[in-house]
A protein has these predicted regions:
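An acidic, low-aromatic, low-complexity terminal/linker signal
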Residues: 1-171
Length: 171
């Protein structure tokens, strides 16, 4: 076997193993999603969000979280889903996203937080190909847990187009 084949095989194993771990799962409509717990800083109930002019519609504005201004993105709108009224289960998941060398605290509005799951690599499959026209690089993979499908997200990529706007809001 060539060294390249061995290195590629090691890389594939490392990638699969690196996806295993604890995920905070949450709902958007009838779909379940997961984000690595290590990115989550806290979960807060829905609160008043101060709108910011001239931002995309999915950027809801900012909140004052214990003296720190946190930009808030409605993940439902970011994904192009129909807007829904917020309920008592709607909450903001405060996450830390990577932008180059810096980290930005952001709030992500979700319909409901479900649970923290320890997902093993055997429960995670690669993201299927949906053709060239659909972008899936924001998905880490698809988990099958307890008979249900969970789409594992890479919020760094989901929110990458927003971080420039949100950094400006944050400053």
């Amino acid at each position: 076997m060539s060294a390249t084949v061995v290195e590629n095989a090691k890389s594939d194993v490392t990638t699969a193993q690196s996806l295993a771990g604890k995920y905070l799962t949450f709902a958007l409509g009838n779909e379940e999603y997961g984000e690595r717990v290590l990115k989550v800083r806290e979960i807060i109930g829905m609160m008043d969000v101060t709108p910011v002019p001239q931002v995309p519609p999915h950027v809801k504005g900012v909140v004052n979280l214990r003296g720190k201004i946190i930009p808030v993105v409605d993940l439902r709108l970011k994904f192009g889903f129909e807007p829904q009224p917020y309920t008592e289960r709607t909450c903001i998941v405060v996450v830390q996203v990577q932008r180059g060398d810096s980290r930005i605290m952001m709030g992500v509005v979700v319909d409901a937080v479900s649970e923290v799951l320890n997902i093993s690599d055997s429960e995670i499959e690669d993201t299927p190909s949906f053709g060239e026209e659909l972008q899936t690089d924001y998905m880490l993979g698809i988990a099958k847990v307890k008979g249900k499908i969970k789409i594992l997200l890479d919020l760094d990529r989901v929110l990458s187009s927003d971080t420039t706007v949100l950094q400006a809001v944050n400053n």
